[in-house]
Regions:
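Chalcogenol-based redox active-site neighborhoods
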Residues: 1-164
Length: 164
């Protein structure tokens, strides 16, 4: 069960890699400024994840107008994320939860991802969404065990509009 609405969002610091170089992103740096939209997804170079992140990238200005900072989070290393973002023209900042600590803290990590393939991929993030308000409180939480199911972005936008 993922973290619930009304609880304080656990703080974290994760790396990102862009053309400007690597940097660390700390969740609480947004507190007091903007709402934060966290989009957990299983992995780069996957059809459903590409569809999700490309769609959000195309709509990034709409999220900005709703006073939200958006981050995509996967267990990929920052270099793989950067290569994927460049290939697919993804503009959402991607954070690397390479050790799966944040996915586990937010309780959205698979015990075993794609168990039928016997790859031993535990800890991979589920597809999940958290909206965290300016005070660091979770205002929306959605998680899905089916990695092919996209979040309900209409509900996400409606909630962000309420918080604006």
């Amino acid at each position: 069960m993922p973290l619930t609405v009304g609880t304080k969002a656990p703080d974290f610091t994760l790396p990102t890699k862009t053309g400007e170089g690597p940097k660390q992103i700390k969740l609480s740096d947004n507190f007091g400024k903007k709402n934060t939209l966290l989009l957990f997804f299983p992995m780069a170079f996957n059809d459903t994840c590409t569809t999700e992140m490309c769609g959000v990238s195309l709509d990034l200005s709409a999220y900005g107008s709703l006073s939200a900072t958006v981050y995509g989070i996967s267990g990929d290393n920052p270099f793989a994320q950067e290569a994927w973002a460049q290939k697919e023209k993804i503009t959402v900042p991607l954070l690397s939860d390479y050790e799966h600590k944040v996915a586990k803290t937010y309780d959205v990590a698979y015990d075993s991802f794609l168990p039928q393939m016997n790859l031993g991929m535990g800890g991979v993030p589920k597809r999940a969404v958290f909206i965290i308000d300016r005070n660091g409180i979770i205002q929306y939480a959605e998680s899905n065990d089916d990695a092919r199911a996209l979040p309900n972005f209409e509900k996400v936008k409606a909630k962000l509009a309420e918080l604006k």
